A protein has these predicted regions:
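Alpha-helix capping/helix-boundary segments
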Residues: 41-43, 93-94, 123
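Class I SAM-dependent methyltransferase SAM-binding "motif I" and its flanking Rossmann-like core
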Residues: 6, 99, 103-143
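Short, charged beta->alpha transition segments
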Residues: 70-78, 124-128
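Glycine/small-residue-rich loop that forms an oxyanion/phosphate-binding "nest" at active or ligand-binding sites
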Residues: 73-115
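Glycine-rich, flexible N-terminal cofactor/catalytic loop recognition
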Residues: 1-64
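Generic beta-sheet signal
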Residues: 4-8, 82-90, 138
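Conserved helicase motor
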Residues: 62-70, 143
Length: 143
């Protein structure tokens, strides 16, 4: 498989990851050595929950926040050009949904890198599902 940008969902709250994330996500996580994250500390904690035996010091983390420039983000994608996949980890829920990960996806698409969203929880989708409203005309205006 060609190196890809994987969008890796994170649990919402204290939910046990095995209850909401498929085993496939774990397999993908274990195949990646480069992660673009909102917060390195919480991303490391999440990865340790998914696989306690993971060697965190063997991984590279790139921090993505409101101070990260587009040029820095483009640099974070450099492993893709070398044939190495990169994962995007948000603070909670799905990356790139009301999240700075969207900027990473846009740059990756412009560079013609494959983007692979993985299955996981989304607070926005869950709120629409539980609202009783028709999701056909749903519009999200931010948190």
């Amino acid at each position: 498989m060609r190196a890809s940008l994987f969008l890796i969902p994170v649990t919402l709250g204290d939910t046990e990851h095995r209850r909401v994330l498929p085993e496939y996500n774990r397999d993908v996580i274990l195949s990646i050595r480069h992660f673009i994250v909102e917060n390195v500390r919480t991303a490391r904690r999440f990865l340790k929950k998914v696989e306690p035996g993971i060697v965190i010091d063997d991984l590279t983390f790139y921090e993505l926040n409101k101070h990260t420039s587009p040029e820095q983000v483009a640099g974070y994608l450099a492993p893709l050009a070398k044939g190495e996949s990169v994962g995007v980890i948000s603070e909670a829920g799905c990356p790139a949904i009301a999240d700075p990960g969207a900027d990473v996806v846009a740059i990756a698409q412009r560079k013609d890198y494959p983007v692979v969203p993985l299955v996981g929880p989304s607070s926005i989708l869950m709120s629409v599902m539980g609202s009783g409203f028709n999701g056909q005309s749903f519009a999200f205006h931010g948190y």
